[in-house]
């Protein structure tokens, strides 16, 4: 999905690479990465031309993209010298993302592991190195937040859009009243039972500035120490309550996110609900997550 498909203002192109013979031959084994034409070239060379050196440039899908997990599991070659440059150094490219130049030595068969690439800026100046690697046996941050769904007795207080696990999808991570506000919602319900995790998720994904170099970096599940760090949890909740990515509006339903009491606001009329102030004080917080 793209910005236009998430918001309902456009459609993605279909059938670009899924009608080829190579796709039909290898898709079942190599997975959805074969929907990319450049992947089909890589797979065919890997399967049919032994001992060659492959030169490849693309976005950083092979070393880090979640959809390329099956590709990384099957592809066997030693990564040679690699370097990364900003994508907008190419003609007619405006996006802020990295493009990698890779060499693969297929005569030295080994799994795709850690790759250390040189990094050059738009002026061709060397600015350092970057490690490209997907941690094995670690859940993505999206799989982690999905695991907080469907807790017994939960009260729904909103919906969090959560497309992708990387910085390029940062703008698609926000909180709204109802998932019906989106034509193609991707995310999870926010409840009184998972608000703590939702706050951590949103704060972590938005508190680090997106750059062209980290654009494809993947967020993974947090270390368990977060669950015992009350100060960190409170900071994340405060960030989430006042973040511009919190788009709760009374026009679309009940606002459970009001963090102030009548006394705080200096008003005499009773507010529609006191969910958030009760939650913050601990009075309305489910015992299972206190």
Q: For each predicted feature, which ranges?
A:
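Mobile active-site "lid"/loop adjacent to the S-adenosyl-L-methionine
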Residues: 2-34
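Short, solvent-exposed loop/turn segments at secondary-structure junctions
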Residues: 2-3, 60-63, 107-109
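A short acidic (Asp/Glu
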Residues: 4-8, 64-71, 94-97
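Class I S-adenosyl-L-methionine
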Residues: 21-28, 32, 91, 96, ...
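Conserved Class I SAM-dependent methyltransferase catalytic core
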Residues: 26-87, 102
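Ordered hydrophobic segments in well-structured contexts
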Residues: 81-84, 98-103, 173, 238
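Flexible, glycine-/basic-rich loop-and-beta segments that form/coincide
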Residues: 96-166
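C-terminal target-recognition/interaction regions appended to catalytic cores
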Residues: 168-290
